[in-house]
Amino acid sequence: MASPQSTKTGLNLPAGMNQTSLRLETFSSSFRGISSLSSPSKSTCSDRFIPCRSSSRLHAFDLQDKEPTTPVKEGGNEAYSRLLKSELFGSDFASPLLSPAGGQGSASSPMSPCTNMLRFKTDRSNSSPSSPFSPSILGNDNGHSSDSSPPPKPPRKVPKTPHKVLDAPSLQDDFYLNVVDWSSQNVLAVGLGTCVYLWTASNSKVTKLCDLGPNDSVCSVQWTREGSYISIGTSHGQVQVWDGTQCKRVRTMGGHQTRTGVLAWNSRILSSGSRDRNILQHDIRVQSDFVSKLVGHKSEVCGLKWSHDDRELASGGNDNQLLVWNNHSQQPILKLTEHTAAVKAITWSPHQSSLLASGGGTADRCIRFWNTTNGNQLNSIDTGSQVCNLAWSKNVNEIVSTHGYSQNQIMLWKYPSMSKVATLTGHSMRVLYLATSPDGQTIVTGAGDETLRFWNVFPSVKMQTPVKDTGLWSLGRTQIR
């Protein structure tokens, strides 16, 4: 049986819907049909299925702070955002955040600066942390990176204790003597009282070279550069030359009135300094005892060193003077009087010509550096102790100094900064004697405590590997066919 609604309209209408609502829907549909003639409209049908997730527990993963932010927290978030963008995209991308409010900055877009991230050529002169490939600004204190400078090397470790200690009885505690020297053939010569002993470093063999007798004593020893002959200065003013291999005396030369406390060889001339204030030049190829006399010091000569090119001779004396001589004159070309105590410690730089270092005694305590070309003092360092000896490393640009009162220490310096590399202690008395091994790595020090101590202070020479030729001439062919 049909319902009353269906009989009137002839349609089966659902419950709750009358003919009036149907008429309104029909009118609305006809109106939409008219409006579609003017402009097309998108279909109201959707091709996506959007599920309802009201029952899911996504709120459990919402870890953001729902509390209202404070100005301090907002400032921290802004600083963090600026730093993050600077780390990811460079400082230029974060710089608009620093611009005043209302500025024309483009901080919202990290790619706002127009820069080429990949280029065929890098302009090293304009490289800065703004480049996406530059190091992090967090690793630089000043905010500027330097692509060309390598990272700083860790400080070199120097052993604080000697690797060998030898007893040296009768080793004299006299500041003005020089009785220890190490030859280029790895033989150490030591003057002990009236005798000279040779210690071979390769096998620790000890050989007695000579005995001057009860009325004489050894005041200085010096090997030739080749290491075959050794000169000995005596308390009677003589200079003896011995064959170190055969242990035979070759020659004896006089000329000094009193003890000969210092000797220095160049390629062919032997220079000797004495308490009589004179410097004698000996040539063993001629018959006379000496070929020239250099007069300039007013007190005992206690330091002598030839430059590596044999052009200049530096002499130090108890008159606090440092004199520089050349081969063409018997008058000093330089008189350096800045020291206030005796100048015994003298060394020439093997790395730079005309660079001379000298050390003063107890009243001076300074190491001074000189340019012998113009006589200018380059630097002066107060060591705090009497400077007894100086030696420049031939392997690296470093210098070692031995000291007396008041600390009796051995100090290693880096030139030209003169920063301390190491300070070595062990001698109970002032360290009066110093010599360097032929490989330039080890030094031996002697003191009035009658001990010789061997220290490893300098690194070895870096051997440069030869560059292999990979060109056309390196194909291994010895002839053209």
From Swiss-Prot:
Which residues fall in a compositionally biased region of kind Basic residues?
A: 154-163
Locations of Low complexity compositional bias?
125-136
* WD repeat start and end residues: 172-209, 213-252, 255-292, 296-335, 338-380, 382-423, 426-465
For the keyword Phosphoprotein, the answer is: no
User: What superkingdom heads the lineage?
Assistant: Eukaryota
* InterPro entries according to UniProt: Cdc20/Fizzy, WD40/YVTN_repeat-like_dom_sf, WD40_CDC20-Fz, WD40_repeat_CS, WD40_repeat_dom_sf, WD40_rpt
Which CDD domains does the record associate with it? WD40
Q: Which GO terms describe its biological process?
A: cell division; protein ubiquitination
Q: Which PROSITE patterns match?
A: WD_REPEATS_1, WD_REPEATS_2, WD_REPEATS_REGION
UniProt keywords, alphabetically = Cell cycle, Cell division, Mitosis, Repeat, Ubl conjugation pathway, WD repeat
Keyword hit for Repeat: yes
The molecular function terms in GO held by this entry are: anaphase-promoting complex binding; ubiquitin-protein transferase activator activity
The pathway entry for this protein reads as: Protein modification; protein ubiquitination
Coiled coil located at which positions?
none
| Entry-linked Pfam families | WD40_CDC20-Fz
- Region ranges (Disordered): 100-165
The subunit field of the Swiss-Prot or TrEMBL record says: Associates with the APC/C complex. Interacts with CDC20-1, CDC20-2, CYCA1-1, CYCA3-4, CYCB1-1 and CYCB1-2. Binds to GIG1 and PYM.
Write out the similarity annotation: Belongs to the WD repeat CDC20/Fizzy family.
Sum up the protein's function in the record's words: Activator protein that regulates the ubiquitin ligase activity and substrate specificity of the anaphase promoting complex/cyclosome (APC/C).
Q: What else is known?
A: FZR2 controls the induction of early rounds of endoreduplication while the remaining rounds may be mediated by FZR1 and FZR3.
Its name, as the record gives it, is Protein FIZZY-RELATED 3
